C-alpha cells in the first residue's frame, strides 16, 4: 500500500505521513472473534507503574488472531477480507472455512480477498499457507514462526517482518532473522509463508504529539531533566551531562550492556544479532 502525504493546511499536517488504507475493509470486526480489552496504563495488579510513559489512548477491541494455524489441517480456507487491527502494526485477514467457521490470521504481503490459504504438513509455497518449517525448501521467506511446537508463532509477526530459511540439519532448521541473528528452530514448528503485510509502516510520520497520545503513549522524559530522587542522571545546577556512564532509572548500564540471562536456549542461537555491529 502507498503512503499518504498532506497539504500543510495546519502545522501538524506538514510532517504527517500515513499509510493509505483505503483498500482495507471499513466495517466492524467479527463479533465472535473479538473480546473487550481494558487498558492498564502501564500499571500492575498493585497499581504501581511497571512500564513508564503509557496511558490514555483510544479504546480498543481485541481481535483473537490465530497464531497456531493447527485447527483445520489440510482444509483450504478462503480469504474474505483484509482488516485493520489497532493492536498490532500488521494487517489481519479474515478467512472462511468450508464448514462455516471463521478465523483471523496475520495477513502476509500480496494476499488478496478471494485467495485460498491452507495449513498442513506439506503445503504449496504461496503467501498465507502454513506448515512445518522442516518441510519448506531452503531460501523460503516465512513469518509467524513458532519457537515451541504447538505454542503458536512468536518470531516475525510485526509489519513488514520476515525470516529466511537458510539451512536444515538433524531435524532442525536454521533461520536468518531481520536483526541478523541466525538461530535453530525445530523442523516441526509451524511457520507461515511470506513476509508480514504493511511494510510501509516504518515510513510513517505522526506529525504531532497528540497522535502519539491517541496510541496510548505518554511523553518520554530524559533522566538528566529529572531530580536526583527520580533518576541517577538527575540534579545539578543548570544543564549537566550526567557525570557517569548512561544508566537506566534503576542504575543498570545502558547502551550496549548485555542483559540476556536465558542460558538454556543459548545453544539455539548460532550467530548473535550483535556480531554484525562489531
Curated annotation (Swiss-Prot):
GO biological process, one term: cytoplasmic translation
Sequence segments annotated as region (Disordered): 222-264
GO cellular component assignments: large ribosomal subunit
InterPro entries named among the record's database cross-references: NA-bd_OB-fold, Rib_uL2_dom2, Ribosomal_uL2, Ribosomal_uL2_bac/org-type, Ribosomal_uL2_C, Ribosomal_uL2_CS, Ribosomal_uL2_dom3, Ribosomal_uL2_RNA-bd_dom
Keywords: Ribonucleoprotein, Ribosomal protein, RNA-binding, rRNA-binding
GO molecular function: rRNA binding; structural constituent of ribosome; transferase activity
Pfam families: Ribosomal_L2 (PF00181), Ribosomal_L2_C (PF03947)
Source superkingdom: Bacteria
Family: Belongs to the universal ribosomal protein uL2 family.
Subunit structure: Part of the 50S ribosomal subunit. Forms a bridge to the 30S subunit in the 70S ribosome.
Function (record text): One of the primary rRNA binding proteins. Required for association of the 30S and 50S subunits to form the 70S ribosome, for tRNA binding and peptide bond formation. It has been suggested to have peptidyltransferase activity; this is somewhat controversial. Makes several contacts with the 16S rRNA in the 70S ribosome.
HAMAP family to which the protein is assigned, alphabetical: Ribosomal_uL2_B
NCBIfam families cross-referenced by the UniProt entry: rplB_bact (TIGR01171)
Protein name (database record): Large ribosomal subunit protein uL2
Protein's gene: rplB
Amino acid at each position: 500500500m502507498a503512503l499518504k502525504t498532506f497539504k500543510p493546511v495546519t502545522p501538524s499536517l506538514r510532517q504527517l505521513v500515513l499509510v493509505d488504507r483505503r483498500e482495507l475493509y471499513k466495517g466492524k470486526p467479527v463479533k465472535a472473534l473479538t473480546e473487550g480489552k481494558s487498558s492498564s496504563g502501564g500499571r500492575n495488579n498493585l497499581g504501581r507503574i511497571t512500564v513508564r510513559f503509557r496511558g490514555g489512548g483510544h479504546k480498543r477491541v481485541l481481535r483473537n488472531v490465530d497464531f497456531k494455524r493447527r485447527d483445520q489441517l489440510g482444509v483450504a480456507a478462503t480469504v474474505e477480507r483484509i482488516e485493520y487491527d489497532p493492536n498490532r502494526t500488521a494487517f489481519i485477514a479474515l478467512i472462511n472455512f468450508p464448514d462455516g467457521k471463521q478465523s483471523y490470521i496475520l495477513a502476509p504481503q500480496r494476499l488478496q480477498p478471494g485467495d485460498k490459504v491452507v495449513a498442513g504438513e506439506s503445503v504449496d509455497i504461496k503467501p498465507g499457507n502454513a506448515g512445518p518449517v522442516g518441510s519448506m525448501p531452503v531460501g523460503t521467506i516465512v513469518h509467524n514462526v513458532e519457537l515451541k511446537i504447538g505454542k503458536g508463532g512468536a518470531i516475525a509477526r510485526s509489519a513488514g517482518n520476515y525470516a529466511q530459511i537458510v539451512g536444515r540439519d538433524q531435524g532442525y532448521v536454521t533461520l536468518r532473522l531481520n536483526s541478523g541473528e541466525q538461530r535453530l528452530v525445530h523442523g516441526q514448528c509451524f511457520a507461515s509463508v511470506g513476509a508480514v503485510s504493511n511494510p510501509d509502516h516504518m515510513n510513517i510520520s505522526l506529525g504531532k504529539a497528540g497522535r502519539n497520545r491517541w496510541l496510548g503513549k505518554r511523553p518520554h522524559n530524559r533522566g538528566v531533566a529529572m531530580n536526583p530522587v527520580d533518576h541517577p542522571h538527575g540534579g545539578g545546577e543548570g544543564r549537566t551531562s550526567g557525570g557517569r556512564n548512561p544508566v537506566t532509572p534503576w542504575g543498570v548500564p545502558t547502551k550496549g550492556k548485555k542483559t540476556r540471562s536465558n542460558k538454556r536456549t543459548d545453544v539455539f542461537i548460532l550467530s548473535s544479532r550483535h556480531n554484525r555491529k562489531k
